[in-house]
Amino acid sequence: MYDARQLYDHLQVAEQDEIPLRPDERLRAMNRPLLAWYEEHARILPWREEPQPYRVWISEIMLQQTRVEAVKPYFERFIKALPDAAALASVEDDRLMKLWEGLGYYNRARNLKKAAGIIMEQYGGRMPSEYEDLLKLPGIGSYTAGAVASIAFGEPVPAVDGNVLRVISRVMASREDILKASTKRWMEECLKETMPKERASHFNQGLIEIGAIVCVPNGQPKCAECPLASVCLAFKQGSTGEIPVKTPPKKRRIEERTVCILEHGDRVGIKKREDSGLLASLYELPNVEGHLKPEELAEAFGLLEGAVEKITPLPEAKHIFSHVEWRMIGYRVQLKKSIPQEFISAQKKELEQVYALPNAFGRYTKLIN
């Protein structure tokens, strides 16, 4: 097992305290003020009102890469439609994608369904209660396994996400790169050793909460409001703006695309993407690489000569993925005849009720009326 003492040796820094604390003492000194603060300041959130294992799991997956306020309505809609693992395991893929539409990172939803199938087959429809078993489910890493195990089952394991990495890095004045897996591993081991075993749920949620609303990123922490200020080395040293340290992200590839709203009466042409790759298996508005001129559209989208009634330019749009940035121009193409057979001819109301179109096309789907 990893020796958490390596962290303590590594983090010996110049103390500003009158009586210096050992690193493990500093972490233990957080516990009481953290728990007291959380009990008083915890936000009221729908998944906290009933912290059942399934609900905790769904909320934690949704909260990956997505803000709390944005998740709330999606969570309530999802739970209403798919209230348990049995419903999730049996839902049709298109229905699942529609429920997830707007949250992005659609592999999260696919992994939820895969995991639900395993829960039904191997665990009798009940969420596994132990960290190591949770870790075996698709889409669940150390953070999510720790969150579900501690919040839903009280297991004394840490849940270290980006918020916690930031808080602990500042408390310890650590200059370790928080994007390195090794940094996360030693932080997990250290917290596992020092966290209050009987209060694991509130401890983990409290750390996450402080990181979300007090110890915020980009050099703007609210130190005057922080219950950990008295033990925080970065605060004492005036280095909160420099911590945490993380590797600058790689530059995204720029990709130009042309998007078309193909219309005939109350119908719109859409396509289903390939089963693998970016936005796999989702529906999309017709689009091609490059920025095309109006006279190039018919050939690019396989439209017959004389099929176009009118072409109207639409506003430019941009969508950022983790590794690529789409810079789009758009056109509304009104057709004289029906939607070509190579496209799905969808009624406009079906775009709201049936087909899941990713946020990448949001600027243009809002213009369909």
Which ranges hold each PLM region?
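Catalytic cores of DNA base-excision repair glycosylases
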Residues: 14-28, 32-33, 37-224, 228-237, ...
